Regions:
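Extracytoplasmic ligand-binding site segments that recognize negatively charged/polar headgroups
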Residues: 8-173
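Paired acidic/hydrophobic, glycine-rich loop segments that form the ligand-binding mouth/hinge
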Residues: 9-14, 172, 189-195, 200, ...
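A ligand-binding cleft/hinge motif common to bilobed small-molecule-binding domains
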Residues: 19-22, 190-211
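Hydrophobic residues within well-ordered alpha-helices
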Residues: 23, 182-184, 232
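A bilobed periplasmic-binding-protein/Venus flytrap-type ligand-binding module shared by bacterial periplasmic
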Residues: 74-79, 225-239, 257-258
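Periplasmic-binding protein-like
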Residues: 138-140, 159-165, 209-236, 281-283
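Mature extracytoplasmic/periplasmic domains
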Residues: 233-303
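C-terminal non-catalytic accessory extensions
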Residues: 335-411
Length: 411
């Protein structure tokens, strides 16, 4: 493609890599030349091409990651103390704690791509954990079989975790920006969110109320760091200025703006951005730690990193969101009621009812890649509607049965 006909806009900036890859494939974004102007930036020591399974820049220079995004939990310390929750949440499993019943804020993964990605991270962590267990316990099993077993079992473990988080949820909202706001106001105690929504809410409360009641955490080993890229549009009317801006954003001066505190030399003048720079050498500057908004965050250093494997769930992203909807959102009233009954039941009834509640064979890994995928890819949209209706009905009936068992009304 040699044409310089464009849309009249210079830069495409922000969001996840998915849209940038699509625009690159369509020929709408082009090589900005930054790889040639600053080859010293594009190495494992500065901006690695790949890290933990995620791509950080396009080898043809069409898009470059500028800042990192991860997922985690925003929480209200005052609400947690009121509920008797010990300390602060640190693991995805904390979303299932019975003390948080009715206090978790979640978003609909079929409406929010960022929240769907967070749910995918939860499932991937369970798969990775299961693989490590099998590598220890079933050494004689061929590697391919171990991986297959880990993926299938980890898929169910992840869905079960999400199901109980959904049982604790006050709601599933259409917008991923709502949970941090509700957590800050005390309407919910914990919310699932993208990192900068949580950190910016924490910053806003500190600035406005001079309060530390809001916090944010990315679970260790529970989330990957993906990038928000920048790209040059084909036919950019102000190409020289746009290229200079790309260079600035990736320079150390530009990177400081993302995470330096307000008033610090090199930092923002009015508002802290609370984003994590993409440059690995930024975190190597020990003397900058006191000037950073998030001095303890070191995304390139982890004893238990989550390595994203697209082959495991990347092809089931839409199917996963659909399954969470029919499992948690559509029968939410029945799920909440069953969970309440289970928590109030005797130990024996609780175990029996929970086994029924968490029987997810209908949405197992092979079903997701088979029945569910076929319905979602069908040209006849009625197929998707009918499957959603059938699965939603089956989950409602399952939850009602689990509740009856918990209350001693069914065998």
């Amino acid at each position: 493609m040699e044409s310089e006909i464009g849309c009249g806009i210079d830069l495409f900036f922000g969001g996840g890599t998915f849209d940038f890859i699509r625009q690159a494939q369509a020929g709408r974004i082009v090589d900005s030349g930054v790889l040639k102007r600053h080859p010293e930036w594009f190495s494992d020591a500065v901006i690695p091409q790949r890290f933990a399974g995620e791509e950080y820049w396009d080898r043809e220079g069409r898009w470059i990651g500028t800042v990192l995004s991860a997922y985690g939990m925003v929480f209200n310390r005052e609400s947690l103390r009121r509920l008797g929750f010990p300390g602060e949440p640190t693991r995805w499993e904390d979303l299932t704690d019975p003390r948080l019943r009715g206090e978790v804020a979640l978003a609909d993964p079929t409406k929010s791509g960022s929240i769907a990605k967070a749910f995918e991270n939860i499932i991937q962590q369970q798969m990775q954990r299961r693989l490590r267990e099998l590598e220890q316990d079933q050494v004689g099993l061929p590697a391919a079989e171990r991986e297959r077993k880990a993926v299938v079992e980890g898929w169910l473990a992840g869905l079960r975790l999400i199901q109980l988080a959904g049982a604790n949820a006050r709601y599933f909202t259409d917008t991923s920006q709502k949970p941090p706001i509700d957590v800050a106001s005390g309407n919910c105690a914990v919310g699932l969110c993208i990192d900068f929504y949580g950190r910016q809410q924490e910053e806003a409360v500190k600035r406005r109320d001079r309060s530390d009641r809001v916090g944010y955490v990315s679970p260790v080993g529970g989330t990957v760091s993906s990038v928000d890229p920048i790209a040059l549009f084909r036919g950019a009317p102000n190409r020289a200025v746009a290229e200079a801006f790309i260079d600035y954003v990736l320079s150390m001066e530009g990177q400081k703006l993302w995470n330096f505190r307000v008033g610090i030399t090199g930092g923002p003048d009015r508002f802290a951005l609370r984003r994590l720079p993409v440059r690995r050498d930024f975190y190597a500057q020990a003397d900058w730690k006191a000037w950073r908004s998030d001095p303890e965050d070191r995304p390139f250093e982890s004893n238990d990193p989550l390595i994203y494997r697209a082959a495991w769930t990347g092809g089931l992203f839409r199917e996963m969101a659909f399954i969470i909807r029919v499992m948690c959102l559509d029968p939410h009233t029945e799920l909440i009621s069953a969970w309440k009954a289970i928590l109030e039941a005797t130990p024996e009834r609780r175990a029996a009812a929970l086994a029924v509640l968490q029987d997810l064979d209908a949405v197992a890994y092979d079903e997701a890649g088979g029945t569910v995928k076929r319905a979602l890819m069908s040209r006849n949209k009625v197929d998707e509607v009918e499957l959603g209706s059938r699965l939603g009905r089956e989950f409602r009936q399952r939850y009602e049965r689990a509740e009856r068992i918990a209350r001693g009304e069914a065998p």
